[in-house]
Amino acid sequence: MSPLPKRALLAITSYHGPFYPNGDNTGLYYTEALHPYTVLTAAGFQVDLASETGEYGIDPHSVTKTALTDADALVYNDKQNDFNQKLAQIKKASDLDPTAYGLFFASAGHGTLFDYPKAKGLIAIAESVWARGGVVSAVCHAPAILPHIKDQATGKSIINGRTVTGFTDKGEVELNLMDKIKELGLVPITQGAIQAGATYKEPEGAFDVFTVVDGRLVTGTNPPSAHATAVKAVEAFEKL
């Protein structure tokens, strides 16, 4: 059994401004936080939700009838649900004690491309978890934070020399968003990973369930992979 606290920090993007070509805002991809939260709490973790600024917004594209299963929709529409209550009372990362956590899980949404690379409070928590031998995990666009999480022993990113996945360039093209990402000067997940010295892997289909486990580093490719990524993160924690 791990000597680390069985407490997880579930990171949420604080950016919820304009992004989509039609003018829609982006933000948190709802199920990429809901599904990991469900897995982590079922595994006995205490889970705190935090963003860099203590604010959040939900990407409207993530809560459409096509994006949510019937079970997800029931949760989303139940404002008294424990997850929704915690989301409504989201914490500011810099107000938290990094040493309280043994697992760091970064949820996603395109908002993460804006704020995660410079989210000093969230990065500090992840660096503490990593330095103490804990698990760092991220899904979909959340690996945008990984190049900026430093290994205190090497001074390099924790993904340097490791294998990761994350949302694919192919997926951005399928969603007709790659041009917008480039226009805004944002860094696609693939590019950020490779620049940080990681080996990037991807599934055959952009929305196939796909995860990569490299020791204490656990990543997933897309929204359908959020549940499986959290399951793998719990398994990695239990092996510590």
Model-predicted segments: where are they?
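Extended, subdomain-level signal for the structured scaffold at the beginning of enzyme domains
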Residues: 1-132, 145-240
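Active-site cofactor/cluster-binding pocket
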Residues: 135
